[in-house]
Swiss-Prot record:
Residues marked Interaction with substrate tRNA (site): 100
BP-aspect Gene Ontology terms: tRNA modification
Protein name as it appears in the record: tRNA dimethylallyltransferase
Protein's organism: Campylobacter concisus (strain 13826)
GO MF assignments: ATP binding; tRNA dimethylallyltransferase activity
Cited Gene3D superfamilies: Crystal structure of tRNA isopentenylpyrophosphate transferase (bh2366) domain, P-loop containing nucleotide triphosphate hydrolases
Length: 291
């Protein structure tokens, strides 16, 4: 039976392994939300599913493009539609999983068009006052300490010459998912740090440095994916800036910082969801799929 669900969690939370296990059990399809697994040749740094896993379960959102090719959220929408069509035809679950909550949020809420950045010649307080006068709908939702949203508001205001709240409603691409069961794996902070440290060591043992060396030699322009955690630190190591021990420590530290940002994003953006440890989350998903 076709059902779709999202399995989210921070990096190193075990969501990919659980998604694979469930997809095997229910003959399902997986859509990866991982913004790095999209790229061919970035295998270890992205903690991409192994080749035998990709053969055993149909994956979408993995090995879609090369690191120097352009990609957009709109393109991801199309990948989602293809994955959903295959799952519907097979009459099986579609399991959406990965660390890029931004993609999931866009699919649920719609996609605002890109707006060129402009020079910010006002303080947060001044932008907020401007929003309060011209766009109280927006100002009522955010504080004057929310730099990111205030800057986005000001960019739209300058670019469109219209009230941003109205402009966004008129120009946002509609959502592609109306309702979705969302399950989040949550770990104790210390346990997650230990998992991150272990995964970092495993990635280095599997050949992360060699992968990075290959990528930096092939892509001299250093496209954005090569600036990701794991690869940027390897570049420092390859250039003699840090030692092997410092490399492992830096990757683990930066990954833990990423996990904190992911947790904050998931908490603030996805209110209606089940949250539990790995075993609890697995149990709840099984109930959902069998129900």
């Amino acid at each position: 039976m076709f059902k779709e669900l999202a399995l989210i969690g921070t990096t190193a939370s075990g969501k990919s392994d659980l998604a694979f296990e469930l997809a095997k059990e229910f003959e399902g399809v997986i859509l990866s939300l991982d913004s790095l697994a999209l790229y061919k040749e970035i295998d270890i740094a992205s903690a991409k599913p192994k080749s035998w896993q990709l053969e055993a379960v149909r994956h979408f959102g993995v090995d879609e493009i090369y690191p120097d090719e352009e990609f957009s959220v709109g393109a991801f929408f199309e990948i989602y539609k293809n994955a959903k069509e295959i799952a519907r035809l097979r009459g099986c679950p579609l399991i959406i999983t990965g660390g890029s909550g931004f993609y999931l949020k866009a699919m649920l809420s719609g996609l605002a068009p890109d707006v060129p950045k402009c020079e910010l010649n006002l303080s947060n307080e001044e932008i907020y006052e401007l929003a309060l006068q011209n766009d109280p709908e927006f100002a009522g939702k955010f504080s004057q300490n929310d730099s990111y949203r205030l800057e986005k508001w000001y960019q739209i205001y300058k670019f469109s010459g219209q009230i941003p709240s109205i402009w966004l409603r008129e120009n946002t691409k509609p959502s592609v998912i109306k309702e979705l069961a969302i399950f989040e794996i949550l770990w104790d902070k210390d346990e997650l740090r230990a998992r991150i440290a272990k995964r970092t060591k495993n990635m280095l043992d599997e050949g992360l440095i060699d992968e990075a060396k290959f990528l930096f030699e092939k892509y001299k322009s250093e496209p954005k994916p090569l600036k990701s955690i794991g690869l940027k630190e390897c570049k420092q190591f390859l250039e003699g800036e840090i030692s092997k021990n410092e490399l492992e420590t830096l990757i683990a530290t930066h990954t833990a910082q990423l996990a904190k940002r992911q947790r904050t994003f998931n908490r603030s953006q996805f209110e209606k969801k089940f949250v539990g440890d790995l075993a609890q989350t697995r149990s709840e998903i099984l109930k959902f799929l069998k129900g």
